[in-house]
Design a protein with these regions (language model features):
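Membrane-interface helix-loop junctions in multi-pass transporters/channels
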Residues: 4, 53-59
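Short, charged, amphipathic alpha-helical segments
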Residues: 32-40
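N-terminal acidic leader/helix
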Residues: 1-20
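A structural signal for well-ordered alpha-helices, especially hydrophobic packing surfaces
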Residues: 14, 18-21, 39, 43-46, ...
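Short, surface-exposed loop/turn segments at secondary-structure junctions
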Residues: 25-33, 60
Length: 60
C-alpha cells in the first residue's frame, strides 16, 4: 500500500471514530468499544507508515 493510501485509510478511520465517539458521548456504551477498536486500527496503520518511511529512507 502506498503512503498516500495509508494516510487516506487513517483519515477514514478517524472520521468513523469521531462518529462513534459522538454516540459514546450521548450515552451509547457499546460505541466506546468501537471507538477503541478504530483507535487501535489507527495505531497499527501509523506503525505501518513509520515502517514504510524508514524503509524508504534507508534505501535512498
Amino acid at each position: 500500500m502506498s503512503l498516500g493510501n495509508l494516510m487516506e485509510t487513517i483519515k477514514d478511520e478517524v472520521i468513523i471514530a469521531m462518529h462513534e465517539a459522538d454516540k459514546f458521548s450521548a450515552g451509547n456504551k457499546s460505541a466506546g468499544t468501537r471507538v477503541r477498536k478504530h483507535m487501535q486500527n489507527i495505531k497499527g496503520i501509523a506503525q505501518n507508515i513509520r515502517t514504510e518511511v524508514q524503509h524508504t529512507k534507508n534505501n535512498m
